[in-house]
Amino acid sequence: MDPIRCFSCNKIMKSPNEKGMVFVRNMKKEDREQFFKKFNYTRLCCKRMYLSAVNFQDELFQYENARSTLNVDGTITKPF
């Protein structure tokens, strides 16, 4: 997930494009610096938010329908 606010300074973190973090992580170091300057991310805490955020939504969605409940009598019930 793209961060909404910086955890340290509480600055609003806008995703400049629809690709978000993957776009920034795949850049070369020089290009990353230009990106941060262009969108005015000068503090290290804000840069850290972009470089360390993990996108795990897609992984969670694949398990959404796999939920099940183990009943007291040992049977398994699926919610849907």
Curated annotation (Swiss-Prot):
One of its GO terms (molecular function) is DNA binding. InterPro entries: RNA_pol_su_RPB10 (IPR023580), RPABC5/Rpb10 (IPR000268). One of its GO terms (biological process) is DNA-templated transcription. It comes from the Viruses. This is Uncharacterized protein 107L. It comes from Invertebrate iridescent virus 6.
